[in-house]
Amino acid sequence: MVLPLPHQRLGLDPVPEYDDLRKDGPVHEYDTEPGMDGRKQWLVTGYDEVREILADHARFSSMRPVDDEADRALLPGILQAYDPPDHTRLRRTVAPAYSARRMERLRPRIEEIVEDCLDGFESVGSPVDFVRHAAWPIPALIACEFLGVPRDDQAELSRMIRDSRESRLARQRTSSGLGVVNYTQRLAARKRRDPGEGMIGVIVREHGDELTDEELAGLAEGNLIMAAEQMAAQLAIAVLLLVTHPAQMALLRERPELVDGAAEEVIRHASIVEAPAPRVALAVLRVAGHDIRAGEVVTCSLLATNRARGERFDITRQNAGHLAFGHGIHHCVGAPLARLQLRVALPAVVRRFPALRLAVPEEDLRFKPGRPAPFAVEELPLEW
């Protein structure tokens, strides 16, 4: 279920509609769209109100109907599509794989992937599209490694993941998507017999008897595709922010110890997931002076909430707290991996390419709108 939000996001510029909305308060009613059964819809843009709603899973449901077979197969990997107790059970199986200890064990391999992919990016020659030659390969390979995909399979699977989301040919998107589904099903079956390393192995060893084969394969596919797609969007936007803010890029190159704050500022400022799954009120409740009744639909704008805390991109920001990964029980379980990718990749990019810059005027860049897929730049031509 996708709710069209009442604005058009154009690149990285502020969204003027949100400035106007904030002046009128944190909660707003907007017109019912076709397919919503006449239910009233609400848009929430206030930080405190968004936190309140996202934390209140007892009175707001995030479950949604799924009719498409392909989406149904993917569903176990989309934790925010579930309410407790199913959400609790599925998240408990996945969360240990994202522990701080496992992230640190993964760091050397991520560093290797980043350097190898930047070698490939550089070898193409200036100018080159950063999205195709770095922003997609890096997270796709990281996601494969994280899941426990054998090294010999990673390059081909990474290509299929990218083509399933990025190819301009519908036939190729479909065939690549089916290739990913078939591979993850075989991978899940293999991990049942021999868990080995990676997220799926961790799940099988610790919770394998709690999951059906379909759920295990769905967790594999969902974490693989969503991790790759969202981290690709985030990495490309991060580099775009740096090359369009050269003083900030120079500061990060001179002071790499600022990378943790830089990563958080990128995540806050870009807000590639504009809104989490819409919530449906389960009871009558009052939010910021508005009565929201049972059955009405509430969309929480993470973009509006995060940008309200500062429109300027500043990697030294001290108040970079944000809700880009959500809040409450549906806080993004993959946030540690997304942060680690940026903390490794950004210093490497600015160190290796100190003169990196756009190869086209910024106004010529094209963006994906961010609903339902993450907000992303389609191509990012760079030169040095």
Where are these regions (language model features)?
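Cytochrome P450
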Residues: 1-384
